[in-house]
C-alpha cells in the first residue's frame, strides 16, 4: 500500500467551496464550488449523455442551462441528498479514492445544530463506509494553521461569520459569536446595488457572475464617508467583462458592497453586529486576564476576509471601541482562504491526534451521538 492509500482525507465543506485533499499536505488538492446543477430543460441536455446531475466545476461550466443549488446554507446542510452527491464527487471524481480505505476529517461551523454533525457522521459510516472520522470546528483549525494556540479567530466564508476566542488551545464556547451573514449575502447585496447601473442579474447563473465581480473588483474603504465623497467628485470606475463580451463599468458599488461587513443594517440585518463589534463582544465575554492576548492575536480566516484593506479597517474600528488603550493586532495570513483546510491537515497528521478519531466500532456501539463526546 502506498502512503497515500493510508493517508487521511481532509474535507472542508464550506457553504460556497469544497476544499479537499490529504492529511499532511500543505494545501488542498482540489477546490471546487459546493454546487449541484440540474438541467432546467431535460431536452436541452441530450448531448451530455443524459446526465441528470452536475457537481462543482462541471455545474459551474454548464450553468447557463442548469438550475444551480448550494446544499449548504449558512453553514448548515439543508439538502442531504445533494450533500451526499457532493461528497461522492469529492471522493471518487476529485480525489479518486475509495473512502472505505481512508479516515475522513470533516469541518463544521461552531454553534451548528447537533443533528447536523450527527447526520454527517451517519452518512460517512453508513453510506461511504469510512473506517474512522472526525469533525473539527472551522475556526479552531484556522488557529492551528497560523501556528498559534491563543487568539481570536474571525472566520468569514460564504455562509457564516463567527468569532471564536481560543486560549492555550481551548476554545471558549460561552464567548463565541456567530452571525449568518457572509460572502453570499454580499453577492446578493451587490446584485441589488448593481441594478441602479441598469444591469439586472436574476438567475442562479447570473448570481455567479456577480460573485466574480465581487471577488475581482470589490474592496473595503478605510474611511467610508471620505470614499463616498471622493467618488461623487470624480467618477472612478473599473471595467468588468461579462461572459457575452460586453463590458460594464462598476463604480462606488466596489466599496459599498463590503461595507455591509461593518454595517449589516445595509443588508437588512439591523440587529446584527459588524465584524468589529463581533470581535469586541467575543473578547469582552472572556476573562479579563486573557483579553490583552486576544486583542494581540486577531486572526482572519475565510474567503470573505480577503477584501483589500479589510485587516486595516478592522483594526481601526476595534481601536475606536473602548477601552482606547488597547492596540489591536490583526493577523491576515496570505493563505487564509484555505486556513481551515490547512489546520485540518496539520491536526490529522499529528501522532497525538490518532486516538481522537471516531472509529467504526465506536460508532456501531454508540450511534451518531458519539460525535458530541469525541469532537468538541
UniProtKB/Swiss-Prot annotation:
Keyword Chaperone assigned to the entry: answer is no
| Cited Pfam families | Actin
Q: Which reaction does it catalyse?
A: ATP + H2O = ADP + phosphate + H(+)
- InterPro entries from the entry? Actin, Actin/actin-like_CS, Actin_CS, ATPase_NBD
Where are the membrane-spanning stretches?
A: none
An example GO CC term for this entry is: ciliary plasm
Keywords on this record? Answer: ATP-binding, Cytoplasm, Cytoskeleton, Hydrolase, Nucleotide-binding
Query: Transmembrane: is it a keyword of this entry?
Result: no
Which protein family is named in the record?
Answer: Belongs to the actin family.
Q: What does this protein do?
A: Actins are highly conserved proteins that are involved in various types of cell motility and are ubiquitously expressed in all eukaryotic cells.
Return the protein name: Actin A
Species name for this entry? Trypanosoma brucei brucei
Lineage of the organism: Eukaryota, Discoba, Euglenozoa, Kinetoplastea, Metakinetoplastina
